[in-house]
């Protein structure tokens, strides 16, 4: 009698996942497992960076802080900072209207500084021949009274005289020194003589690298903060053992304090309206802190710290599993003892939960799933290593801080913005292309592993079993559980079963030949009968036509 279909099928895992990925060839491919590599969340707070607090200037600008705007007294002495936070339009800037020369360059310098130590270089009390306390303005109020910047001194004439100033400071510190000074531009000649006595004045400043001569620009101007005059501030970095020399006969705003640069490092001036969140992070953006090991984010292009790379993408998902096409249950006519078993062509197996690839067998002892642990583990290791490699390579920590330009540098600013946008487009394209290509390769890798497992079984069974074309093999001999296990572990003994398989194969072939002979006789009979009937009809038609 004929052997009732003992079978073994090769298939792959399926589950209830609805995760979808894109590949080079397809979109929205449902897979069993996937890994998101794009961070899209933040905490909406300003945090410490690696345990170091930021310097949050609140309503003060950098200029207001450095010059000592009376409304910025909380920042007279500040500890080490990780980064500086300034609002887009801080209220407490230059209280006395004017300009801060090379302000953007100074901010760029601050992006490489983590700590200042404020030191007195020319005491206010040392100006015995000039009024050092009368230089105040209603534009810089403090407690309802006129005041002035805390770190500089506005020198006024004394006893209707303004003797020429000659003052020097030698930097005996081991650190660089940030020194600030300024010039007052009066509204008219009357104000000039009222404040400084001398109608024609100048300010000279010199170091080993600086040679500056300033003269006041007297002009009628619109009032700002109640003032028609203007002040212009300057700065320089004084190196150790270098001296700065001042000479002036009027309009001089002298330095009282300077900033010793005691610690340099990676910092930034970040524009943000957020409040301090009493938290810690490795990556800060103006929108909030990011705590993520993902290689990409789409939160904000400007960052400080160890951050993922910003891209414009909305979705970057790497597949780690297989195509998820669960086998659909459908009514089938029963075949053999255990019915038909679909293989990997018809869909994945949700019943196989302990591996990615494996077997389903059926024989007289029963049926069941078994994962191929070796191929599954190799695949898991391969995919995991690949994903980790991609993340490691792309997770080079990036820092992108904003750059500021003055009004004369708008064309440079526009060019810089176009270049940065171009770089972002390239990074985004590269990231998306990388994901598409790697997803395609991963799915092909899984398909190849299933095929390899199939070929492993096929090469063992040879002509002892029949390929059903759906990932399954039907044995020409009885295959009990021990036999099935030998197929799975690669120790199937082909010679042991070949004689019995050969007899059954010949018996099946004989049945096919006998059936084929019957079909051929019926076919010949049908052909002859049809031809004879057609000949009789033609002859009858001819006789009828002739008789007419």
Swiss-Prot record:
Per the record, the GO terms for biological process are: clathrin-dependent endocytosis of virus by host cell; fusion of virus membrane with host endosome membrane; fusion of virus membrane with host plasma membrane; virion attachment to host cell
- Protein name per Swiss-Prot or TrEMBL: Hemagglutinin
Which terms in the GO cellular component ontology are assigned? host cell plasma membrane; membrane; viral envelope; virion membrane
- What is the membrane topology here? Single-pass type I membrane protein
GO molecular function (one): host cell surface receptor binding
Residue(s) at site: Cleavage: 335-336
Q: Source gene?
A: HA
Species this protein is from: Influenza A virus (strain A/Chicken/Hong Kong/FY150/2001 H5N1 genotype D)
Quote the function comment for this protein: Binds to sialic acid-containing receptors on the cell surface, bringing about the attachment of the virus particle to the cell. This attachment induces virion internalization either through clathrin-dependent endocytosis or through clathrin- and caveolin-independent pathway. Plays a major role in the determination of host range restriction and virulence. Class I viral fusion protein. Responsible for penetration of the virus into the cell cytoplasm by mediating the fusion of the membrane of the endocytosed virus particle with the endosomal membrane.
Glycosylated residues are 15-16, 28, 170, 291, 489
* Superkingdom of origin organism: Viruses
Give the record's family classification. Belongs to the influenza viruses hemagglutinin family.
Tell me if Chloroplast is a UniProt keyword of this record.
Answer: no
Q: Which residue pairs form cystines in this protein?
A: 9-472, 47-279, 60-72, 95-140, 283-307, 479-483
Q: Where in the cell is it found?
A: Virion membrane; Host apical cell membrane
Q: Which residues lie on this side of the membrane: Cytoplasmic?
A: 542-548
Covalently lipidated residues, kind S-palmitoyl cysteine: 546
Question: What Pfam families does UniProt report for this protein, alphabetically?
Answer: Hemagglutinin
Assembly notes = Homotrimer of disulfide-linked HA1-HA2.
Task: Quote the PTM field.
Answer: Palmitoylated. In natural infection, inactive HA is matured into HA1 and HA2 outside the cell by one or more trypsin-like, arginine-specific endoprotease secreted by the bronchial epithelial cells. One identified protease that may be involved in this process is secreted in lungs by club cells.
The miscellaneous remark of the record is: Major glycoprotein, comprises over 80% of the envelope proteins present in virus particle. The extent of infection into host organism is determined by HA. Influenza viruses bud from the apical surface of polarized epithelial cells (e.g. bronchial epithelial cells) into lumen of lungs and are therefore usually pneumotropic. The reason is that HA is cleaved by tryptase clara which is restricted to lungs. However, HAs of H5 and H7 pantropic avian viruses subtypes can be cleaved by furin and subtilisin-type enzymes, allowing the virus to grow in other organs than lungs.
Give the Extracellular membrane side ranges.
1-520
């Amino acid at each position: 009698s004929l052997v009732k279909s003992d079978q073994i099928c090769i298939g792959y895992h399926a589950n209830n996942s609805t995760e979808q990925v894109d590949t080079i060839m397809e979109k929205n491919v449902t897979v069993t497992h996937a890994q998101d590599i794009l961070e899209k969340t933040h905490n909406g707070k300003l945090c410490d960076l690696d345990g170091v607090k930021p310097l949050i200037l609140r309503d003060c600008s950098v200029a207001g802080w450095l010059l000592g705007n009376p409304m910025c007294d909380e920042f007279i002495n500040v500890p080490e900072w990780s980064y500086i936070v300034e609002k887009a339009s801080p209220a407490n800037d230059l209280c006395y209207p004017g300009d801060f020369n090379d302000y953007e360059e100074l901010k760029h310098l601050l992006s490489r500084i983590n700590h200042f130590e404020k030191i007195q270089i020319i005491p206010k009390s040392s100006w015995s021949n000039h009024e050092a306390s009368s230089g105040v303005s209603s534009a810089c109020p403090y407690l309802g009274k006129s005041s002035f910047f805390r770190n500089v001194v506005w020198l006024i004439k004394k006893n209707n005289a303004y003797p020429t100033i000659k003052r020097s400071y030698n930097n005996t510190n081991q650190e660089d020194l940030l020194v600030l000074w300024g010039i007052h531009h009066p509204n008219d000649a009357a104000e000039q003589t009222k404040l400084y006595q001398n109608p024609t004045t100048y300010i000279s400043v010199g170091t080993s690298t600086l040679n500056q001569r300033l003269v006041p620009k007297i002009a009628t101007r619109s009032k700002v903060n109640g003032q028609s005059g203007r002040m212009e501030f300057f700065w320089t970095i004084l190196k150790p053992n270098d001296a700065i020399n001042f000479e002036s006969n009027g309009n001089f705003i002298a330095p009282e304090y300077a900033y010793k640069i005691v610690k340099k490092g990676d910092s930034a001036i970040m524009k943000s309206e957020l409040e301090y969140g009493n938290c810690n992070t490795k990556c800060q953006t103006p929108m909030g802190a990011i705590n993520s090991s993902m290689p990409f984010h789409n939160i904000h292009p400007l960052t400080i710290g160890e951050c993922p790379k910003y891209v414009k993408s909305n979705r970057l998902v790497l597949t780690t599993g297989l195509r998820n096409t669960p086998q659909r249950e459908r009514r089938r006519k029963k075949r053999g003892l255990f019915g038909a078993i679909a293989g990997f062509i018809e869909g994945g197996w949700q019943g196989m939960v302990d591996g990615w690839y494996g077997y389903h067998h059926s024989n007289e002892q029963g049926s069941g799933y078994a994962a191929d642990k070796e191929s599954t583990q190799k695949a898991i290791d391969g995919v995991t290593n690949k994903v980790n490699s991609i993340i490691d390579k792309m997770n080079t920590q990036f820092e992108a801080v904003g750059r500021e330009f003055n009004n004369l540098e708008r064309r440079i600013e526009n060019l810089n913005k176009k270049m940065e946008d171009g770089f972002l487009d390239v990074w985004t394209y590269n990231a998306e292309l990388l994901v598409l290509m790697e997803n395609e390769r991963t799915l092909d890798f899984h398909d190849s592993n299933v095929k390899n497992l199939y070929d492993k079984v096929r090469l063992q069974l040879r002509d002892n079993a029949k390929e059903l074309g759906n990932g399954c093999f039907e044995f020409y001999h009885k295959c009990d559980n021990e036999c099935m296990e030998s197929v799975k572990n690669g120790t199937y003994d082909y010679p042991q079963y070949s004689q019995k398989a050969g007899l059954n194969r010949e018996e099946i072939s004989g049945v096919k030949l006998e059936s084929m002979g019957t079909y051929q006789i019926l076919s010949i009979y049908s052909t002859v009968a049809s031809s004879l009937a057609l000949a009789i009809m033609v002859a009858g038609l001819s006789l009828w036509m002739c008789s007419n």
